[in-house]
């Protein structure tokens, strides 16, 4: 019986390690970032938003320093992001973004990127901004479970 348990534990450990080693972080970063950027384009659609959200767990935790310091995972985290991001679809008249660098390790990715935008607020006034940010993503089963954005 002990030998059977040891064999099962070894198979489970080997399978988890093999699955983790097979994850294509490079492809994930490129696809995730492209999907994120598409949600900010002047012609962004609900389909673009849904494609981006497909990279996230349903209970995503989302934190933007310094304004939103809570990274708690919420059962309706993805639904909350959908609601929040839907308000901003198509508000940009111009949006540019570029990855500066990225790194990854077991179930984690950091993406340093720069982005700039111009657009119109709902009151008709113009806005523009340019930022460099570091996004740290914690992955679970190949999806983003917690994201933290560090920027000024």
Task: Locate each region found by the language model.
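Positively charged n-region of N-terminal signal peptides that target proteins for export
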Residues: 1-4
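Short, low-complexity N-terminal intrinsically disordered segments enriched in polar/charged residues
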Residues: 9-12, 16-55
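Residues that line or immediately flank small-molecule/substrate-binding pockets and catalytic motifs
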Residues: 8, 64, 151
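A solvent-exposed, acidic/Ser-Thr-rich amphipathic alpha-helical stretch
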Residues: 23-26, 49-102
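A beta-strand edge to alpha-helix "cap/lid" segment located at domain peripheries
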Residues: 21-24, 82-152
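Short, solvent-exposed loop/turn segments that connect beta-strands within catalytic domains
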Residues: 41-46, 68-69, 122-126
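Short regulatory "switch" loops immediately downstream of catalytic or recognition motifs
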Residues: 33-41, 62-67, 117-120
């Amino acid at each position: 019986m002990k030998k059977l348990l040891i064999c099962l534990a070894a198979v489970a450990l080997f399978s988890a390690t093999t699955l983790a080693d097979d994850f294509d972080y490079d492809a994930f970063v490129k696809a995730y970032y492209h999907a994120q950027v598409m949600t900010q384009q002047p012609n962004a659609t609900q389909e673009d938003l849904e494609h981006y959200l497909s990279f996230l767990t349903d209970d995503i935790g989302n934190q933007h320093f310094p304004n939103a310091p809570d990274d708690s995972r919420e059962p309706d985290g993805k639904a909350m992001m959908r609601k929040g991001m839907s308000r901003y679809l198509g508000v940009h008249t111009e949006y540019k973004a570029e990855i500066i660098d990225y790194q990854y390790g077991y179930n984690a990715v950091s993406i340093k990127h720069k982005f700039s935008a111009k657009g119109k607020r709902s009151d008709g006034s113009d806005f523009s901004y340019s930022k460099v940010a570091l996004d740290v993503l914690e992955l679970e089963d190949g999806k983003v479970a917690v994201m933290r954005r560090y920027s000024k």
